[in-house]
């Protein structure tokens, strides 16, 4: 297995693309930390699927949009695992609305999760990756960042 002994943190891993990334990393031998902010049941389902296939995983709740909570999550994971080899910044949300109808909270929620969340995770893991002399950071994005969609000004900007 290509990733045997590696520790991988996947944000937004309870469903969609993040779920599939988590399953694929586990299949390649990585210990997978399934980060989620919404449904604990869906995150535990991903963990269960990984462990039933012989892998190792755990679910960790944290809104990556929150700077302090993201820092706390990273410190806790490093204390327990001693390293993080792979960070996949996948967490993302949408709050679609035409710009003229969009309120500031809808705009901010998307930017805080999709853009600031990526910053928060990289900020709080980068020193550890330098200390361990290695690591991989993978940032997932959307084609919507290149080709905008009506009603998604916030999402496209993020």
Label for each model-derived stretch:
Residues 40-41, 61-73, 104:
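The beta1-alpha1 cofactor-binding region of Rossmann-like NAD(H)/NADP(H)-dependent oxidoreductases
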Residues 122, 158:
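Active-site helix of classical SDR
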Residues 100, 147-153:
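Active-site loop immediately N-terminal to the catalytic Tyr-X3-Lys motif
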Residues 98-99, 106-111:
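Substrate-binding pocket helix/loop in short-chain dehydrogenase/reductase
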Residues 142:
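Residue(s) in the substrate-gating loop at a strand-loop-helix junction
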Residues 28-45:
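Conserved glycine-rich Rossmann-like NAD(P)H-binding loop of the short-chain dehydrogenase/reductase
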Residues 7, 14-16:
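Conserved glycine-rich cofactor-binding loop
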């Amino acid at each position: 297995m290509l990733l045997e002994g590696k520790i991988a943190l996947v944000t937004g891993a309870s469903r969609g693309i993040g779920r599939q990334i988590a399953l694929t990393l586990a299949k390649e031998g990585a210990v997978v930390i399934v980060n989620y902010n919404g449904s604990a049941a869906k995150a535990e389902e991903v963990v269960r699927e990984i462990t039933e296939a012989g892998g190792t995983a755990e679910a960790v709740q944290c809104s990556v949009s929150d700077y302090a909570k993201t820092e706390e999550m990273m410190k806790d994971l490093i204390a327990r695992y001693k390293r993080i080899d792979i960070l996949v910044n996948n967490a993302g949300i949408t709050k679609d609305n035409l710009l003229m109808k969009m309120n500031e909270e809808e705009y901010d929620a998307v930017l805080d999760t999709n853009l600031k969340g990526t910053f928060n995770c990289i900020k709080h893991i980068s020193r550890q990756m330098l200390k361990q002399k290695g690591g991989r950071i993978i940032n997932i994005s959307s084609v919507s960042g290149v080709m905008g969609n009506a009603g998604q000004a916030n999402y496209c900007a993020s």
